[in-house]
Amino acid sequence: MSDDHYIPTAKHGLTPEPGERLARPLQRFAKLSSSGGIVLLLMTAIAMIWANSQYAESYNEIFNETKTTIAVAHMPDHAASGHDDPATYAADPHDSEHTEDHSESAIQDATHAIQKTVADGEDGHAEDSHGGHGWKPVTDEPMWYQQHSTAMWINDLLMAIFFLVVGLEIKREVLVGELASPKRAALPIFGALGGMIGPALIFVAFNYGKETIGGWGIPMATDIAFAVGILAMLGKRIPNSLLVFLTSLAIVDDLGALVVIAVFYTENLELAYLGYAGTIVAVLMFMNVLRVRWITLYLVMGLPLWYFVYMSGVHATIAGVLLAATIPAHARVNAVNFVFSTRKALDVFANAHDDPETAVTESSERRAAVTAIMHNSRLVMPPLHRIEHALHPWAAFVIIPIFALANAGIPIHGGIVENLSDPAAIGIILGLFIGKPLGIAVLCFLACKIGIAALPKGVSWRHIIGAGILGGIGFTMAIFIANLAYANDPSHLEHAKLAILVASGISAIAGGALLLTCKSAPEPEPDSIGPLVDDDDDD
């Protein structure tokens, strides 16, 4: 049941505002299970068209050539003491008036240090962007800086937020979801193992002894947004238990991909930075043990964790998963306390002595009651759930589409057949389209045969095979691993990305077509309570 079923609508005497009416189509689209996949597909198409059009040079310039620097400058002594130090600072020859205060001078000094870094070590003092006022530091070298292309910032920093969401989903599933029960978890776990082993073996068979062998982890991945989106578009033909199975399988698959990235695609480890990262994780775990539920503190601690993981040589996105593992999963108050305190607040709200038409902001009693209800609602939701709920739309509709735009722009030089004749491309296509469904079906069959798992109610083996084919939609995670595997080999990287797109497209069409031949799923029994309002009335 959607959370939005409890939002008051016209049926409750609430007339939609003009802005709400305009936003309604977008809100309804965002509620669709397939919406994330549709946006992802659209951005992929834009990237491909852009990279192969007359504007291809601008695509490469924006994402690969443009460098962005984040820097922390040395702060001058006088910024702290309030006195200028002539041994450290030289007067600007263009400066005719020294009327700016010390705080502005400090800001200008920091700005010059950053400008100096971006200029790649250019000698001399740069002109001040505010007309040359203030003092200039003799030494412009910043205390710390990181300079990367736009694509690298997206892949290393922005995707860490996506992996935080993935980590939260994994933790939730393990604690209270399908993976919490060993019996229910067995089938998706075995399916995911088969879906990782099968593609990897096929890739190795075509690339053993070749320079492309490092890409063996590419076809192991499954894109949840695409695969689940296609299942959702098939509607009533698909039993809900199959949707749960594929989602759980993809989550276990993501966990396997994270292990592969951390273990096999990490080259030079810096143990000191790894130790710093471990210390922060230990502090976060201790905060969890102490029942600290201040979400902001966890997220702030995630920033140095990201930096230390990045500097350690392990891929920086692993920091998102580590942070997710430490987020508290238990609420501050239980359901009984929530109901009691909220009813009390509602009684205060209903029995307020003000005129019923008085605005809440003008009534101290009602304002206090609403504040109490908001506070109770926050305490009854675990921090894990609150962060996941807040970040999921950003991951689905902002981060992943931006990632697709920055990484799916593959210039096709020569014919498509020529590009796909690369052993890496062959291994990826066959691994995703053949190895995925074969591995999933075989290990699921073995798990059922030996009695440690059973098919969900309403799910047939044709459903399992169809879902396995949809598991061959690698896309996001596959492209991510390809960037790591062929980071120093642009030619093979382009071939690998093209192969991922081709294999994902074939898997989507074939899997959807097979599932369309399945009998419609039986209608679910109506909810004993049912929604308070109809979906069509949601705003």
Residue locations for each model-derived region?
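Predominantly late transmembrane helices and immediately cytosolic-facing juxtamembrane segments
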Residues: 3-32, 48-52, 288, 294-301, ...
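C-terminal ends of transmembrane helices
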Residues: 23-27, 164-180, 228-239, 282-293, ...
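Hydrophobic core segments of alpha-helical transmembrane domains in multi-pass membrane transport
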Residues: 39-52, 162-168, 198-203, 280-286, ...
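Transmembrane alpha-helix boundary signature
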Residues: 50-62, 74-79, 165-180, 197-217
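Low-complexity, proline/glycine-enriched hydrophobic segments characteristic of transmembrane helices
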Residues: 56-148, 341-369
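Structural signature of hydrophobic alpha-helical transmembrane segments
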Residues: 152-163, 211-225, 266-279, 317, ...
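Entry/N-cap segments of selected transmembrane alpha helices
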Residues: 173-200, 270-279, 412-435, 461, ...
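Functional cores that coordinate and move charged inorganic groups
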Residues: 231-347
